[in-house]
């Protein structure tokens, strides 16, 4: 198991996935995002939702902005919808996937 360059817990299971940053040859760089898993129905991928709130001064109200990301799910990490996970940016793995799951956050 190799050091991937960020401070995350290593998964206990091993996998043979070449797109795994821990057991394969995938390098990560750029953004690190924490969000909630929305869907795991894609084969080997997840949909992640990140919410952010900002104040609109004129109306004294908050606006909620929701961003969705698609991320590759290595075989050594188990997640379900509703779990909070940390994803890291990597090279483009598919048409809409350029992130990989690196840790399940409690």
Curated annotation (Swiss-Prot):
A Gene Ontology molecular function term of the record: structural constituent of ribosome
GO cellular component, one term: cytosolic small ribosomal subunit
Disulphide bridges, residue numbers: none
Any one GO biological process: translation
Taxonomic superkingdom: Archaea
Residues of the signal peptide: none
Entry keywords, A to Z: Ribonucleoprotein, Ribosomal protein, RNA-binding, rRNA-binding
Pfam families membership: Ribosomal_S17
InterPro entries on file: NA-bd_OB-fold (IPR012340), Ribosomal_uS17 (IPR000266), Ribosomal_uS17_arc/euk (IPR028333), Ribosomal_uS17_archaeal (IPR019978)
Described purpose of this protein according to its UniProt entry: One of the primary rRNA binding proteins, it binds specifically to the 5'-end of 16S ribosomal RNA.
Listed NCBIfam families: PRK08572.1, uS17_arch
Subunit structure: Part of the 30S ribosomal subunit.
Family statement drawn from the similarity comment of this UniProt entry: Belongs to the universal ribosomal protein uS17 family.
Protein name: Small ribosomal subunit protein uS17
Organism: Picrophilus torridus (strain ATCC 700027 / DSM 9790 / JCM 10055 / NBRC 100828 / KAW 2/3)
